[in-house]
């Protein structure tokens, strides 16, 4: 793998990965240790942190730009159910999905 093809493969596969192991497998990595090391070198952060950030960006985008039901957003972002989405938002974004969406709507007015 060249560095460029590694990055391309990660960007192509990350939306289907729930964790580091999933992403390594989707990227056809022969070793999880080597995958983590290469990822850290090229992305300048651990895999799990990067995946969490990407998921947070996706959640925010859907909450702020769509009127999709929260269950649909949960499914699109890889959460088992709406409760996991809510927990993720509270932990990583500082508020509930409903409040994040409401605050965005209020800011537009």
Each model region followed by its residue ranges:
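Inter-domain helical "communication" segments and dimerization helices
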Residues: 1-19, 26-31, 102-109
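Basic, amphipathic alpha-helical hairpins
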Residues: 4-19, 39, 43, 60-69, ...
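Terminal helix-turn-helix DNA-binding modules in bacterial transcription factors
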Residues: 21, 41-80, 102-109
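Append "Primarily bacterial transcriptional regulators
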Residues: 22-30, 35, 39, 73-80, ...
């Amino acid at each position: 793998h060249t560095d460029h093809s590694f990055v391309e493969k990660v960007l192509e596969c990350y939306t289907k990965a729930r964790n580091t192991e999933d992403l390594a497998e989707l990227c056809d990595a022969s070793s999880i240790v080597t995958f983590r090391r290469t990822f850290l070198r090229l992305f300048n952060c651990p895999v799990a942190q990067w995946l969490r950030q990407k998921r947070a960006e996706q959640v925010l985008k859907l909450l702020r730009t769509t009127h999709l039901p929260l269950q649909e957003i949960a499914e699109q972002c890889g959460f088992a159910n709406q409760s996991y989405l809510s927990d993720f938002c509270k932990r990583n974004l500082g508020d509930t999905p409903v409040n994040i969406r409401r605050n965005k709507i209020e800011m537009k007015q």
